[in-house]
Amino acid sequence: MYKFQKANIQKQSKQYIWLLILGGVTILASLIYLLCLDSVNKKIVTDSIYTYFHNFRKEEYDAFSLFLGSVGSNLLFTIGIWVLGISMIGIPIVFLLYMAKTFLFGFSIFGILQTFGLKGILTALIYVFPFKLLFILGMVVLTFHSLYFAFRLCSNLFRKKSYHLQQYMIRYSKLLGILLILSVIDALWEAYVLPNLLFLF
């Protein structure tokens, strides 16, 4: 029993590492994509980011609209990955959603650095920590369990293996609840706390 649990933990650790590497590669791809943009599109990106943060300093933004946009995006990825995990046919889309989220995460960071230079390091840190980073790590965990659940469903149906998924479904649902709460907290932070923090610098 102990050997089985140890082997299972080692296997899951490798899968988590694989997802982290995939996320890291996707973040690196966002940097390469940004560097490969022509001057016109680079200017569009930098102007958009500059306006976004400049409006915070001038207090020319609608906090509630910003909250709705942020929480809507977070919920789209969270619920999407969770639902696809119980659909079996959604395994490739789970990967695409995970890669899309990590790509946007990296693109935001590198876009800030490109716009503000060295001064952008502090801005990027304030933007990322703590909740956006926690949310991305939560996406790693959710993606792992989504794929795990989907593969177990496939094994039950097509390989005639018996996995007791009811108990796992309870844990999977609890994970969704945690991520939904984190999604809302991240959106609240971005809309109501982040602007005030940036205003101090």
Regions inferred by a protein language model and the residue ranges of each:
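Cytosolic juxtamembrane amphipathic/interface segments immediately preceding
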Residues: 2-16, 158-167
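Perimembrane loop-to-helix junctions flanking transmembrane segments
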Residues: 43-65
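N-terminal signal-anchor transmembrane alpha helix
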Residues: 8-42
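Pore-lining transmembrane helices
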Residues: 65-134, 141
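Membrane-water interface at loop-to-transmembrane-helix junctions
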Residues: 13, 58-72, 169-174
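Terminal transmembrane helical module of multi-pass membrane proteins
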Residues: 139-201
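Transmembrane helix-loop junctions in multipass membrane proteins, especially transporters and channels
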Residues: 35-46, 86-89, 116, 147, ...
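Alpha-helical transmembrane segments of multipass membrane proteins
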Residues: 25-30, 77, 135, 178, ...
